[in-house]
């Protein structure tokens, strides 16, 4: 759309009159392949000069039909699909799905397995926030912090590789526990990392919050008031930056989070600055949680002993026919949760992540619905961008921290 008003105004006219010489309203495409959109996101942007009048997100470019596919796979097979939605905090999807199925089954997760889940989930949250911090500051024109953030993230990925064998898409959490126990070298290496990380977080906050350039670029930009944030369904750091104290780990505790001591960082203005600062401070809380978890990491089993849920150890397959039968049924037919429906919310790096699962008594879910925080948070983009400048729109997108695999699914 383009509108022009071409009035004959003298070239020596005063500035307030010269502004009316030519006014244009243009609609442009940003994306779907554009570095500032943090994925395959297409934005229809209506501009008046540099001012953003309207932003309409167009999604679906990364749609893979995860939810429908999961309805045609057994509950165990679906574990391979869940980490591929939010590939930056994949442990969050693994955990949320496992908790929902365990609620259907009435499975009992051993204390050691719960603690391992918390440790890996918070490490994954740290890794995700480091990507957010590095790429967010990169969008504001700062190249060096990007390398600083990825330095620590590389250490976390090394820890994941020791435990799961994978740096991404870990497939480590299982229904009723975790795949296997932690390797011997994991805890000592994790403690070394935890000694360094608090100082790094202090450096990140100083680099960001104390920089007058970042302050001018981020403060007062993309403001989302608390009442608007609630109406739009925002969760996670984007909601807490607006001053709303809501964290699923506190409101609806799971995996023993109610027994951990940690704070919920809040913002004051709900702008780009607060959304970035809240996530930096959340990293400190994740370190606190991991340290507490290490102190209570007692020896014990890591899977529910129920043979209907957990396959038998491989060494029993050579001596026990009963173990062979359970093993065969587990990997061919799977288990059959009773009829019912559950919704389990969790706190991912991007906000409330929930799995709604309906069971008809079969070995496959009748319905799976994922409450993905990136999808919900993205709908605040038109409100946050209206009236801002084009370069600020890039910063606003980064501050919402969307993952397009989480949006499209």
Curated annotation (Swiss-Prot):
Its EC number is 7.1.1.-. It catalyses: a quinone + NADH + 5 H(+)(in) = a quinol + NAD(+) + 4 H(+)(out). InterPro entries: NADH_Q_OxRdtase_suD, NADH_UbQ_OxRdtase_49kDa_CS, NDH1_su_D/H, NiFe-Hase_large. It is found in: Cell inner membrane. It is a peripheral membrane protein. GO terms for cellular component: plasma membrane. Keywords: Cell inner membrane, Cell membrane, Membrane, NAD, Quinone, Translocase, Transport. Disulfide bonds: none annotated. It holds the Pfam family Complex1_49kDa. GO terms for molecular function: NAD binding; NADH:ubiquinone reductase (non-electrogenic) activity; quinone binding. NDH-1 is composed of 14 different subunits. Subunits NuoB, C, D, E, F, and G constitute the peripheral sector of the complex. Belongs to the complex I 49 kDa subunit family. NCBIfam families: NuoD, PRK06075.1. NDH-1 shuttles electrons from NADH, via FMN and iron-sulfur (Fe-S) centers, to quinones in the respiratory chain. The immediate electron acceptor for the enzyme in this species is believed to be ubiquinone. Couples the redox reaction to proton translocation (for every two electrons transferred, four hydrogen ions are translocated across the cytoplasmic membrane), and thus conserves the redox energy in a proton gradient. This is NADH-quinone oxidoreductase subunit D. It comes from Thermus thermophilus (strain ATCC BAA-163 / DSM 7039 / HB27). The gene is nuoD.
């Amino acid at each position: 759309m383009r509108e022009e008003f071409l009035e004959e105004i003298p070239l020596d006219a005063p500035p307030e009159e010269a502004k009316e010489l030519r006014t244009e309203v243009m609609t442009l495409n940003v994306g779907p392949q554009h570095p500032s959109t943090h994925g395959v996101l297409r934005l229809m942007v209506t501009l008046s000069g540099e001012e953003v009048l309207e932003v309409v997100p167009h999604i679906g470019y990364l749609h893979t039909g995860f939810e429908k596919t999961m309805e045609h796979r057994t509950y165990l097979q679906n574990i391979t699909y869940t980490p591929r939605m939010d590939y930056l905090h994949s442990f969050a999807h693994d955990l949320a799905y496992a908790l929902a199925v365990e609620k259907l089954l009435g499975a009992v997760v051993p204390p050691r397995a719960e603690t391992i889940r918390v440790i890996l989930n918070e490490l994954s949250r740290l890794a995700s926030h480091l990507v957010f911090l590095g790429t967010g500051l990169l969008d504001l024109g700062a190249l060096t912090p990007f390398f600083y953030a990825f330095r620590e993230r590389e250490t976390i990925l090394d820890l994941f590789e020791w435990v799961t064998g994978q740096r991404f898409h870990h497939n480590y959490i299982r229904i009723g526990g975790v795949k296997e126990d932690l390797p011997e070298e994991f805890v000592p290496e994790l403690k070394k990392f935890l000694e360094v990380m608090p100082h790094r977080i202090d450096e990140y906050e100083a680099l960001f919050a104390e920089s007058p350039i970042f302050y001018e670029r981020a403060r007062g930009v993309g403001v989302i008031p608390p009442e608007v944030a609630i109406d739009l369904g925002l969760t996670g750091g984007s909601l807490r930056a607006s001053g709303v104290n809501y964290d699923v780990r506190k409101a609806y505790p799971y995996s023993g989070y109610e027994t951990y001591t940690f704070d919920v960082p809040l913002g004051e203005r709900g702008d780009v600055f607060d959304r970035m600062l809240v996530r930096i401070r959340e990293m400190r809380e994740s370190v606190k949680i991991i340290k507490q978890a290490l102190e209570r990491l007692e020896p014990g089993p890591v899977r529910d002993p129920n043979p209907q849920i957990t396959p038998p150890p491989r060494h029993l397959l050579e001596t026990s026919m009963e173990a062979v039968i359970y093993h065969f049924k587990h990997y061919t037919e799977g288990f059959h949760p009773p009829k019912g429906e559950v919704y389990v919310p969790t706190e991912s790096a991007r906000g409330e992540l929930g799995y709604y699962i309906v069971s008809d008594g079969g070995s496959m879910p009748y319905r799976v619905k994922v409450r993905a925080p990136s999808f919900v948070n993205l709908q605040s983009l038109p409100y946050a961008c209206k009236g801002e400048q084009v370069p600020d729109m890039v910063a606003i997108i980064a501050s919402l921290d969307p993952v397009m695999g989480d949006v499209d699914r």
